[in-house]
Amino acid sequence: MGKEAGAAESSTVVLAVNGKRYEAAGVAPSTSLLEFLRTQTPVRGPKLGCGEGGCGACVVLVSKYDPATDEVTEFSASSCLTLLHSVDRCSVTTSEGIGNTRDGYHPVQQRLSGFHASQCGFCTPGMCMSIFSALVKADNKSDRPDPPAGFSKITTSEAEKAVSGNLCRCTGYRPIVDTCKSFASDVDLEDLGLNCFWKKGEEPAEVSRLPGYNSGAVCTFPEFLKSEIKSTMKQVNDVPIAASGDGWYHPKSIEELHRLFDSSWFDDSSVKIVASNTGSGVYKDQDLYDKYIDIKGIPELSVINKNDKAIELGSVVSISKAIEVLSDGNLVFRKIADHLNKVASPFVRNTATIGGNIMMAQRLPFESDVATVLLAAGSTVTVQVASKRLCFTLEEFLEQPPCDSRTLLLSIFIPEWGSDYVTFETFRAAPRPFGNAVSYVNSAFLARTSGSLLIEDICLAFGAYGVDHAIRAKKVEDFLKGKSLSSFVILEAIKLLKDTVSPSEGTTHHEYRVSLAVSFLFSFLSSLANSSSAPSNIDTPNGSYTHETGSNVDSPERHIKVDSNDLPIRSRQEMVFSDEYKPVGKPIKKVGAEIQASGEAVYVDDIPAPKDCLYGAFIYSTHPHAHVRSINFKSSLASQKVITVITAKDIPSGGENIGSSFLMQGEALFADPIAEFAGQNIGVVIAETQRYANMAAKQAVVEYSTENLQPPILTIEDAIQRNSYIQIPPFLAPKPVGDYNKGMAEADHKILSAEVKLESQYYFYMETQAALAIPDEDNCITIYSSTQMPELTQNLIARCLGIPFHNVRVISRRVGGGFGGKAMKATHTACACALAAFKLRRPVRMYLDRKTDMIMAGGRHPMKAKYSVGFKSDGKITALHLDLGINAGISPDVSPLMPRAIIGALKKYNWGTLEFDTKVCKTNVSSKSAMRAPGDVQGSFIAEAIIEHVASALALDTNTVRRKNLHDFESLEVFYGESAGEASTYSLVSMFDKLALSPEYQHRAAMIEQFNSSNKWKKRGISCVPATYEVNLRPTPGKVSIMNDGSIAVEVGGIEIGQGLWTKVKQMTAFGLGQLCPDGGECLLDKVRVIQADTLSLIQGGMTAGSTTSETSCETVRQSCVALVEKLNPIKESLEAKSNTVEWSALIAQASMASVNLSAQPYWTPDPSFKSYLNYGAGTSEVEVDILTGATTILRSDLVYDCGQSLNPAVDLGQIEGCFVQGIGFFTNEDYKTNSDGLVIHDGTWTYKIPTVDNIPKEFNVEMFNSAPDKKRVLSSKASGEPPLVLATSVHCAMREAIRAARKEFSVSTSPAKSAVTFQMDVPATMPVVKELCGLDVVERYLENVSAASAGPNTAKA
């Protein structure tokens, strides 16, 4: 191999990062671009959110220069999957590179800020780069006309999809979409939502008011790197490949590659062959590889040939490039391109290769869409094995035994089918319509017909349904060939298909997947049958079907319909602004939004690593109840990186094995000696880097024993059977209302022992659990923690280490999303990190990988409710009894609070009388904890399930039953006591009536009925639900300090987790000190800085939870300002005697000279008579359900929420929209599944699907209702962080209405004794659940009826 025998030299990677040159020599070949950026450069914008290419937090722009053409190619990429060596001689641009504090912000960053599109901010740099990349891509299209000044060439449709691969858990996406669309030249600016650039309805929406955009303003490829590349090319031409000292090889020909294969060091287990490395996002590396061979530089693998017979794509052509080539082709090619646009996300498609996808499908049970659609198109592949080149059909290639790593896929040929009498269609069913989600089933069908629509040839390909690879349904193909389509023929084809498509044992949703395959085939064949000019009696499913046929066939236009998923996203916001307390009440933009967008905002993992820093990763139990006998490691490269393992034995004398604690008993930090649930921490691996620690933890081998142990308790049913409960303290127990037996005696009708279930939900904060511990002198330690509860974190660390609280300093600046998951659950990571640092006397950092975080998180409480309800014939309910089982997990955590929250939310209706039996079950699963609207969202759902059951039993309109059982103020006081407040503040009834009783609602309901009567395969539903949510006020500290120059520093007990706490506090500070300023304080806004929480600086900080932290922090700041105004007023009056106006700076300078204490630090406690109050809202949602797939599109949601007098309408709007969309996830697609041992198996972005931009309502309207002033509340404001989440119940209820319409149509019933319209739908209502309720066999039964009707009038089935 030329120089192979010589001494190996370490290659140097040269790249530009934001225009600056970097060299990396001797870097491990497994190092990702993200790791390099975050550890070897000042860049912190790209974040590690998942490590799978599934979240977009790490997106960067990569630019490559071709000296032969003098052209630069730019594309977005997922830096967590991109290997550093693969971007040698490339330029990388991050969010800091397009704009920052010093150089000025880019219009993308300014508009994200101005449209209120950043909350916690952790996802914002990735969003920023996805938008920027989309603009660059559009503006580089020379075939498009130049846009008007300030706009891009991007279209609104493209803009909406620009962030389709990016996840955000905070905003609900609507403001992000508006930001994207603001750049589109075809946008109507008046349609964009609330922003800081113009006042809607008062000022014209003009592009001149937006931060000016100029394409090409950012240089993405510096000239110095171009010169280096040109110079290097002259030097290295024809130089043979050399041995690599750092293990990275990049052959330039197939011959060079085979010489590497023949090397003595080549070994399948330690050498990884890569083109883009995106496959590691699906199949994670279990060990470190010490050698990589990059085949992307082999020219033969990058060929693109088009002729009149086929398109040939080299195996390392990116999926994005393949889409570009195929889009400019015939029907089949364009359809393939359309389907590939739904594979992964833009930033993954840009680097993922077409051949890599096919090779994964060949070697592994990978649910490839690429293989399926290419299989149906009759593709062939060329492979090289040793010196032989072989050609196979794709079907033959997939069916071969898995290829070894020496088998090289060269290219893929897709034949030209022409367009005469050819029909090609592809299908996929996935939780996200735009992609970024693996499909339950995918399929592609190609048919060639004669002029009379006789099927001459047909190919039916199915994939992702639970077998090793895509297959062709050949028996069905053979049956259909030569036949004309009829209902009978299609039915027989489906019967054959069901024998062919058989998921392997262990496949989830087995029957659903078969039903999907049937639905897809039916959709294709019925459409084909109806494409004839001859009439057909088969109802074709709605959707877009395009056929290109000969001229003697009627135009296909009659078959094209607009898919609901393609509707543009629209919105409307209504709110009232008040100047009463200005600048409080103004919709100012979020503090720090620009630095969040630029990536300069510092989160825990962004803090530069201290000298000698070590890194930790958890080893967790995979058994639910077992003795832990030992921890060892496999012999591997990763295990060689282990420095030590920290366990319970390392807890100092006097310390406690404690990881969290709340209210009652705590939870152990380590399983010792028994692991009590799968996912429990057993030990912490310590290594030199986070990647080494994470990889070493995977290599841990734990020896377990179940000797003398009882079987684990995993479910509510297990716990009840074995009397395993957590006791509820009497002071936390909810109280019943009235005499249940008397209420039941008054009822005309009764429903007894009906049951409904709700599963768990994962927080999916974008920043996983993180901590950095730095040991200090005299047994002191400082911990930077991503926590909602610094005070508790401090206390627990001190107890764990056995040192005084004052030795522990916990600092938390900002948190990248919390939702309750950074409260009790954050303390485990902080305690483990602190213990390791304390033991080793070196700084230790932990940043959990997404899988570990998901396995250990616990999440929302699963529960089961059994209810008995009595009611009158008019729908008035007289009595309700509820048996409630709550799965708490292994420790109490917040679980004792759950019954009160659940019953509190349930009480939104007047049940007449109410009694309940609640059991908080102790089980061998990870402790469940507080998650946004804990208990309330479940209680509200249970209430709606009961109301809908009653309405169904009486055949009454559901809203009529809801309205009849809403409280009047008298009954509200009976159910809620003092929390009901004043009658003037009870706004629920008026909000509900505004939505449910409006003429518009009645019109929409009538239109839905009309739609359902004329559409067999898609049904719509609409529902309006009320919400009542009780919140509690807690004591909180605050401190306002005025510096000598007049700038102001503020400390509060609350933590900025994205909820806009700092923004509201800043406004309140300006308002509170405004009496000292001529303009009422607005001049002070820019002088206020809210600083990070520090447990040794501000004690008794409490927790950031329960939705009221912002208002209580604001109130304590206001009181601080009152104290400061009292001190400063005499000086102000003295100065005013000499001058009419007093400048702020002069006032403070004089006060400082007079030695006035310019700091105030009160501790606010709520009035004993007003510790809680009620929040109200109502929400209407309209959905469309695809009966054939179970997919749901939310067509419109209208929310009316009572914010009182909002402290900041922009912030509160963001909270309302964001938590509503989080609720949509809970009720629809978020399936937090565990295995039979209770171990979470939906543990990453591939299997756990939070909402993306394609899941939000197509029309999303919010009205912020201003209820009567209430001086007991903080400036008459109300909470917004959690209550609106329960309004997402409206989506679930609307889905039920749509499903009910389908069940009526197809006479679907769960049992012969039950009506088709009465059924329970548990949470989450995923696609398989919806499809099953609509009927898994509706297609077969429909075709049987049609066939029977065709055969004769007396043979049709009912």
Curated annotation (Swiss-Prot):
As to how many cofactors bind and how, the note says: Binds 2 [2Fe-2S] clusters. Binds 1 Mo-molybdopterin (Mo-MPT) cofactor per subunit.
Q: Which family does it belong to?
A: Belongs to the xanthine dehydrogenase family.
- Indicate the segments forming the FAD-binding PCMH-type domain, all copies: 241-419
Which terms are listed as keywords in the entry? 2Fe-2S, Abscisic acid biosynthesis, Auxin biosynthesis, Cytoplasm, FAD, Flavoprotein, Iron, Iron-sulfur, Metal-binding, Molybdenum, NAD, Oxidoreductase
Q: Which Pfam families match?
A: Ald_Xan_dh_C, CO_deh_flav_C, FAD_binding_5, Fer2, Fer2_2, MoCoBD_1, MoCoBD_2
Q: Tell me which tissues or organs this protein is expressed in.
A: Mostly expressed in roots, and, to a lower extent, in mesocotyl, leaves and coleoptile. Accumulates in apical region of maize coleoptiles (at protein level).
Please give the superkingdom of this protein's source. Answer: Eukaryota
What is this enzyme's class at the first EC digit?
oxidoreductase
Q: What is stated about pH in the biophysicochemical properties?
A: Optimum pH is 7-8.
| Chain positions covered by the region annotation Disordered | 532-559
- Domain 2Fe-2S ferredoxin-type, residue spans: 11-98
From the UniProt record, which GO molecular function terms apply?
2 iron, 2 sulfur cluster binding; FAD binding; indole-3-acetaldehyde oxidase activity; iron ion binding; molybdopterin cofactor binding; oxidoreductase activity
Which sequence ranges are marked TM in the entry? none
Keyword DNA damage (UniProt): no
Question: What does the record say about activity regulation?
Answer: Inhibited by 2-mercaptoethanol, p-chloromercuribenzoate, and iodoacetate.
Protein name per the record:
Indole-3-acetaldehyde oxidase
Source species of the chain: Zea mays (Maize)
What subcellular compartments does it reside in?
Answer: Cytoplasm
Catalysed reaction equations from the record: indole-3-acetaldehyde + O2 + H2O = (indol-3-yl)acetate + H2O2 + H(+)
Q: Which cofactor does it need?
A: [2Fe-2S] cluster; FAD; Mo-molybdopterin
Q: What does this protein do?
A: In higher plants aldehyde oxidases (AO) appear to be homo- and heterodimeric assemblies of AO subunits with probably different physiological functions. Involved in the biosynthesis of auxin from (indol-3-yl)acetaldehyde. Can also use indole-3-aldehyde and benzaldehyde as substrate.
Q: Which GO terms describe its cellular component?
A: cytoplasm
Annotated positions binding [2Fe-2S] cluster: 50, 55, 58
The biological processes this protein is annotated with in GO are:
abscisic acid biosynthetic process; auxin biosynthetic process
**UniProt EC number:** 1.2.3.7
Q: Where is the composition biased (Polar residues)?
A: 537-554
The record's subunit annotation is: Aldehyde oxidases (AO) are homodimers and heterodimers of AO subunits.
